[in-house]
């Protein structure tokens, strides 16, 4: 319950009893004025405080318990003896009933010492010159039970309950804020995995509060909340997330399979395990980490070292070792039959061996 509800209850508990007191004062003043107006009729006793002129247009008379009331019959009668009064219970009222409580004088009904049971409808009947009736409602204010004290007690009890509930809520909120601030301070003092655990505890402890409580919480923990958010961001970047990493790795593997990118580390092993091809050439990928040759033309390509590496497809022919030996034997046999060309054949044989050796190395 909010603070303005407490203030409203407090104001109501003060205004209601004051209204009862003011009503009693106004009623007593009205009674005294009406008694002065009714003083023209000398036949009325001086104890009557209300006259027939006090009723309103809807023929209702309001009287306080313990006072006396005079009700006038507004019908025209040739003789006052022809006027008869009856209450709401149907009893005929005269001076003989209840020890002179009701007194009929001319066309007036005087009720002394009005009680709460006297409330109801009072009707006067006229028999001459014509038969007619006139009714007046009497309402009695109940004051013997002291209702003002009753209302004051009820309002005080309601205000006390409201005050206790608000104080309890404020104490709980203050305790919660202290615990939250303590948890944030412990978060700043911890390191590693415990920091993440403290972050979860703080997240559980921060409630979802609206209106003024949110503003109060923001004012109390504004700076530390910003620090906490910054530390959480740094912690989220440093702590690995296994499911996310596995998903990224699976995505990268699918991408590698789609573009068929070979791993340079496994390239040498794949070349060794690959069987020798026949005379038809195959396409091989040259390892970019291979050293440059010591040829004289290599110095002219020093400027290409800083350029981005590119893949070059080279078509080569690979021969088996048995084929190489047979070719070598045939070349040696031919050298015996042609001695004049011994020097040229030897040079061609050496060049062929060097080429075969380089091809086997590749």
UniProtKB/Swiss-Prot annotation:
Region described as Disordered: 282-306, 319-362
Taxonomic superkingdom: Eukaryota
Posttranslational modification: Glycosylated.
The keyword Glycoprotein belongs to this UniProt entry's keyword annotation: yes
Domain Ig-like C2-type span(s) in chain numbering: 45-137
Principal subcellular localisation of the protein: membrane
Annotated S-S bridges: 73-124
Protein name as catalogued: Microfibril-associated glycoprotein 3
Spans traversing the lipid bilayer: 147-167
Cytoplasmic side: 168-362
GO cellular component labels: plasma membrane
N-terminal signal peptide: 1-19
Record topological domains on the Extracellular side: 20-146
Organism listed in the record: Pongo abelii
Localization (cell): Cell membrane
Function: Component of the elastin-associated microfibrils.
Bias (Polar residues): 319-337
Lipid bilayer topology: Single-pass type I membrane protein
Positions annotated as glycosylated: 36, 41, 110
Alphabetical UniProt keywords: Cell membrane, Disulfide bond, Glycoprotein, Immunoglobulin domain, Membrane, Signal, Transmembrane, Transmembrane helix
